[in-house]
Curated annotation (Swiss-Prot):
InterPro entries assigned to the protein according to its UniProt record, in alphabetical order: ARM-like (IPR011989), ARM-type_fold (IPR016024), CAND1/CAND2 (IPR039852), TATA-bd_TIP120 (IPR013932)
Low complexity compositional bias, start-end: 225-237
Protein name: Cullin-associated NEDD8-dissociated protein 1, C-terminal part
Keyword annotations of the record: Nucleus, Repeat, Ubl conjugation pathway
Note, other: In E.nidulans, CAND1 is separated into 2 distinct proteins: candA-N (AC C8VP82) and candA-C, corresponding to the N- and C-termini respectively of the protein in other species.
GO biological process: cordyol C metabolic process; diorcinol metabolic process; orcinol metabolic process; protein ubiquitination; SCF complex assembly; sexual sporulation resulting in formation of a cellular spore; sporocarp development involved in sexual reproduction; violaceol I metabolic process
Region (Disordered): 1-24, 64-103, 189-237
Length: 1041
């Protein structure tokens, strides 16, 4: 039935139940078409929305079906403020609805029509979102007011439930493109599923080797800074802000007669509002306090636990309500929260003691956020009432830890909460919020839990929180620190890798914080070193860097105790292997402090005699150079000894080692170093490639120490386009790897260097290294150079554009705020420009650059993916003009020059898969996945990964495509290589079959009912074929997992 026909029916004078049934069927059909055929339905969208809105208020038994009041616009006469009010919100208007004059009490089934209309709107919002087909006007001036107006006019529970769910979908769509910090500890785009992990970040990836100072890890107890709710003048956020008072008031009214399921939907909507309008519920907390307290009272009344009769839905409602409290606590300013939270704390405490472990665990999560909201730095003054509330939260958390009858998950969560509370109440200001007695008792409890195998890991992480935020020596006592250190050291010998890593990370925090490190005595440090030395091994580099850093922090003032044969042997064992990044920086830091303490003689002797050229010459050379400079006269050798060695020896290995030592020495000595460029440049002509590269690296290191003396020579060589330009690019790279050291001295020559790099990098062999140098140079002064990328992208030379694209991609790994501020207005225009490059190689580079931007700068580009990803989806299509025939002997072969481009496009789509754009274009996305399965094996593999991910992200759409997937999977499994096929072709076919069987297994497990529902006949036949013909392979896959 068409929308117009439906509209005609609505004007009939008589109420015909059969007509209602037909309308219901039509609306259900429209919902299915919108969900399954979104592209084809775009032209019918306006009519579809109009029909849904009309039948949303279809109620033939009520005489007046006039237009509903608008959500915003003119003020109601009774309004005392600037917020538009809905007139029909009083309770009395709904208590005796059937007694109203316009209502007929005949058997009324029209609610089914209204429910289907609401579900249709839900499908429209979920499928199209805020996209090209559905603009903000339709969402916020048509759909939203109609839903809000219907909230309290609707009588049927099931229709109300659909209305609330539809509004929740709309609210989440409002947040598309905005990054929200959630209580789970992630930056999340609401409604997108995109998460950026807040792992411990060491902001030292670009730090110079010479000034490396490891940073303290972040703590989950530190919380996140609150951002004031934005007040946009226009747009979806503005529309939502205007509607917020009416929505909240309507939900509170609806709550009074709501069932558990409807209450749960209301709570979920309130949580979405709290996250989307970050801090925006501040003026409405008093209104929603009663509904929240109403749910918590089910615990206060002493209801039995889930195991002995409490309904699952009631428990789920409690969990959602506690999650709402967490979200509000995290997103709203403490000044507004205090009365609200203090009123709810008793109910939360009772929920913590609930026998349903899921309720108890979620209540503890709420306690964590409440604690953060009621402690410094968010609260500065400790009132008696506040202290009393915090002590109650402390008591309930502590009691759950010591309650042996509590579920393990609850006890572990309580330990975490206790750690947060103790960490947040340290220092002089924080100590006023928790008594000394309770603090001491809590610290003892953490040690006690550290000794228990089941709670050990949680205790380790809680202690780490305390260590990171300890800001006074008096916050912890010496015995506690020493006992904790001994226990943590013992865990380093355990086989549990997660426990070992967490224990080492906590030891790192204890050693790096001077307030906790001050409690160490000689015996503790000696025992700790003995636990750490076995970890100074290249067998597990993830444990190596923290171990080196811990010892480096303990050595100052304790060198005679700690610098011994065991430590020296361990250092000498790791320099035999190539090291880079943080591990190399940590090693050089340790070598540096050993030299500064005057204890480097034994280490120097061992490095020269026992390792020497047998180790990695770069690592050994940098270690010796560091020790030479910082050990001074105590190490038994001088720089001149290595200069003489370089001039005399003909052994390439010895030359490489001497060059590395001299380069590192010159770097650290700076302008006081007597070495000149002529020490290194003659070796550019060496017959040994290793020596040539070593001399280039050493020249760059020396140049970083004395830019004024070295840069003119390097720049002169580059401007001449010297045949040795590739080596000079290596030197420039090393020079720019010390940005803080060289920034000021490079600045006067930066423009010349920039231009020289672009010229030299035109050569194919120089392009990759040159682009990295251009990127590093741009990062020295982002405001000056990042805007220039746009200018060079218009250059007619494809080679120049290639360099600029690669250089820009290199810069994206920089996480500094100063760079992000420059990049924010430029990144999208730059990417759009790059993606429009017609040069095939450059276009592929642009795709990999967008991929890098999605991984590194998602917050900056997320609101603009609608501008970027449609072109990428276009690049996943096979382009016949890029396929050519090549004659090879008597045979003709087809060569697809677009294959790598398509592969890069699919990789980029995969990277953006869990963003709001992809999920709102899911039908189009699946069409490209289906096409990719028919493509080459590399692309097919990516499509299988995408399908696997969409099982979780878009289960309904994935299930809808099972038949289409099965057709393509069948073709792959039935493919038989020719009898004369070469080994490579046979292996390729086997790899394709295995990949299909793996994803088949995942789909089968995710949708076990698909074979029995009767809607997926092709999928059912396919699964029967797979089990019959590939049962053995499936069994093998099961055993693997």
């Amino acid at each position: 039935m068409s929308s117009d026909a439906m509209s005609d029916y609505s004007h009939d004078d008589e109420h015909d139940p059969q007509t209602d049934e037909l309308r219901e069927t039509a609306l259900v059909t429209l919902e299915a078409l919108i969900s399954s055929c979104s592209s084809q339905m775009q032209s019918y969208l306006p009519n579809t929305i109009n029909s849904a809105l009309r039948f949303l208020k279809y109620d033939p038994n009520v005489a007046d079906m006039g237009e509903d009041e608008e959500m915003s616009g003119t003020q109601d006469d009774g309004s005392e403020d600037d917020v538009t009010e809905e007139p029909d919100l009083e309770d009395d208007d709904f208590e005796d609805f059937e007694e109203e004059g316009g209502y007929s009490d005949i058997d009324d089934m029209s609610w089914k029509v209204r429910r289907c209309a609401a579900k249709l709107l839900y499908a429209v919002i979920s499928t199209y979102g805020r996209g090209r087909a559905l603009d903000d006007t339709s969402l916020y001036q048509q759909i939203a007011p109609a839903i809000v107006a219907r909230f309290n006019k609707e009588r049927e529970e099931s229709v109300k439930l659909e209305l609330v769910s539809t509004m929740d979908a709309l609210v989440r769509k409002t947040a598309e493109g905005s990054m929200i910090m959630t209580s789970s500890g992630f930056l999340e785009s609401v409604g997108s599923g995109s998460k950026i992990s807040r792992k411990r970040r060491r902001q030292d990836s670009d730090a110079s080797m010479i000034d490396f100072e490891p940073s303290m890890g972040t703590s989950s107890a530190a919380g996140t800074p609150l951002a004031a709710p934005s007040s946009p003048q226009s747009g979806p956020q503005s529309e939502l802000a205007n509607a917020l008072p009416v929505i909240v008031r309507s939900l509170v009214t609806m709550w009074k007669q709501a069932s558990i399921h409807l209450k749960q939907a209301i709570i979920i909507l309130l949580k979405s509002l709290a996250l989307v309008r970050y801090g925006g519920l501040a003026d409405h907390l008093q209104q929603i306090e009663d509904p929240i307290a109403d749910v918590l009272k089910s615990s206060l009344s002493g209801a039995p636990s889930a195991s002995i009769g409490i309904s699952a839905s009631a428990g789920t409602l409690q969990i959602e309500t506690l999650s709402l409290i967490s979200a509000i606590s995290e997103t709203h300013a403490s000044d507004a929260l205090l009365p609200f939270l203090i009123a709810l704390i008793p109910g939360v405490i009772v929920a913590v003691n609930d026998k349903n472990y899921k309720v108890s665990s979620e209540a503890l999560a709420a306690v964590e956020q409440i604690v953060k909201a009621l402690t410094p730095p968010r609260v500065t003054t400790a009132s008696q009432d506040l202290i009393f509330q915090l002590e109650k939260l402390y008591d309930v958390s502590h009691s759950r830890i010591t309650d042996t009858s509590a579920d393990l998950e609850v006890r572990q969560r309580a330990i975490h909460v206790l750690g947060v509370l103790l960490a947040r109440t340290s220092d002089e200001q924080g100590s006023a919020f928790l008594s000394f007695e309770k603090r001491s008792k809590g610290l003892v409890t953490l040690v006690d839990r550290l000794k228990n195998e089941t709670t050990r890991l949680s205790a380790v992480r809680a202690i780490d929180d305390v260590a990171v935020l300890c800001s006074r020596k008096d916050d912890v006592d010496s015995n506690w620190v020493r006992e904790v250190t001994a226990e943590l050291g013992a865990q380093l010998r355990k086989s549990d890798r997660v426990l070992r890593s967490a224990s080492l990370e906590t030891l790192r925090s204890l050693s790096m914080n001077p307030n906790t490190r001050a409690h160490y005595d000689g015996e503790t440090m000696k025992n700790l070193e003995e636990c750490l030395i076995p970890l100074i091994s290249v067998e597990d580099v993830h444990l190596l860097a923290p171990s080196l850093i811990i010892i480096a922090k303990l050595v100052p003032g304790n060198a005679q105790l700690l610098v011994n044969d065991g430590l020296v042997s361990a250092i000498c064992s790791i320099v035999r292997t190539s090291l880079a990044g943080t591990v190399l920086k940590a090693l050089l830091l340790l070598v540096k402090v050993i030299g500064e303490e005057g204890s480097g003689l034994t280490l120097m002797q061992n490095l020269l005699q026992d390792v020497g050229v047998n180790g990695d010459t770069s690592v050994v050379g940098r270690s010796i150079g560091t020790l030479l400079v910082h050990g001074g006269s105590n190490v038994g050798v001088r720089m001149e000894d290595f200069l003489s060695e370089l001039q005399k020896t003909q052994d390439p290995q010895r030359q490489c080692l001497a060059l590395a030592i001299l380069g590192e020495s010159a770097l650290r000595l700076g302008a006081s170093c007597s070495l000149t460029p002529n020490v290194f440049i003659p070796h550019f002509n060496s017959k040994s490639e290793k020596v040539r590269l070593a001399s280039a690296t050493a020249l760059g290191n020396a140049a970083a120490g004395n830019v004024k003396a070295y840069l003119p020579t390097i720049l002169g060589g580059l401007e001449k386009s010297d045949p040795q330009s590739y080596l000079l690019l290596h030197s420039v790279k090393e020079l720019l790897q010390h940005p803080e050291m060289v920034r000021r001295d490079v600045a006067p020559s930066a423009l010349k260097l920039w231009q020289a790099l672009l010229v030299v990098s035109k050569e194919e062999d120089n392009r990759a290294m040159g682009a990295e140098c251009v990127g590093r140079l741009a990062l020295l002064d982002p405001p000056a150079y990042i805007p220039q990328f746009q200018e060079y992208l218009a250059n007619g030379d494809a080679g120049i554009r290639s360099i600029v694209v690669s250089a820009f991609r290199f810069t994206l790994s920089d996480s500094r705020d100063v760079f992000n501020d420059v990049l924010r207005p430029l990144i999208v225009p730059l990417l759009v420009n790059m993606l429009s490059d017609r040069d095939l190689g450059n276009h592929r580079l642009a795709l990999t650059t967008l991929n890098s931007a999605i991984h590194n700068k998602l917050a900056l580009i997320l609101p603009h993916l609608g501008e970027l990803l449609p072109a990428v989806l276009g690049d996943t299509q096979i382009k016949p003009e890029l396929i050519r025939e090549v004659q090879m002997g008597p045979f003709k072969h087809k060569v697809d020059d677009g294959l790598e481009l398509r592969k890069s496009a699919y990789e980029t789509v995969y990277a953006a898969l869990d963003t709001s754009f992809s999920l709102s274009h899911i039908t189009e996305l699946y069409s490209r996945i289906l096409a990719g399965i028919d493509d080459e094996q590399d692309i097919r593999t990516i499509c299988n990964l995408m399908t696997s991910k969409l099982i979780t992200l878009a289960p309904e759409e994935t299930q809808r495509h099972l038949d289409a997937l099965s057709e393509r999977y069948t073709a792959i499994l039935n493919f038989k290589p020719k009898e004369n096929a070469v080994k490579q072709e046979i292996e390729k076919a086997q790899e394709a079959s295995t990949g299909v069987l793996k994803i088949t297994r995942e789909l089968s497990k995710a949708f076990p009912n698909a074979e029995t529902m009767g809607d997926h006949h092709k999928w059912k036949a396919y699964m029967e074929m797979v089990r019959a013909q590939f049962g053995t392979q499936l069994s093998n896959l099961e055993s693997e997992f």
